[in-house]
Amino acid sequence: KLDTTFLFEIPLFRKLNNIEEQNNWFSASDKPALSNYLSSELKTLNNEAVVSNYKFGKVNETGFLDTKKLKENYTNYLVAENCYLEETFDYSKLVIQDDQIEYKDIRAKQIVFAEGFGLHNNPYFNNLPLDGTKGELLIIKSENLKLNEIINSSIWILPLGNHLYKVGATYDWEDKTNQTTEKAKTELVEKAAKAQELA
């Protein structure tokens, strides 16, 4: 229906930092629930910009979802179908019945709340012992990195093309704002420099 691609297959390699991590990788890859997803053969990454004293574990069936592109295209589709409403949800207007829910003039069988850490404001879920975390990422440019795969270490690095890479992510349990921070930028730059030599 949307006539475009959002899911891109790309290999993911987990940087293993010592013998113990390699042994843990072998143990995990032998488990029946994980064996289809974790390669039992460790890989060498032939990339001078990525320094590692040990091999990498390859995760199978990996890629990334371009969520921004998906959201934009799907929103446009729903608008064209007259099925999209953008407003602040008013919980007091939600009526739950045995066989349906009603919200203003909308009737449906089910409702899905996709609110992230906003669930604390949702009267149906604010009693759950869940706490949101804020994650930040950077887009960097590196002509020397030349990655065609995702690298996962203390951070992850995702190639975007044209020498651009997404680097992430931070985890902040205190700051719940939508604003980027210099603290997160510094953390990501330092981890990127330590985990990989980005020339």
Where do the PLM segments sit?
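A short, surface-exposed helix-loop junction/capping segment
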Residues: 50-56
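Dinucleotide-binding Rossmann-like beta1-alpha1 core, especially the glycine-rich loop
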Residues: 1-48
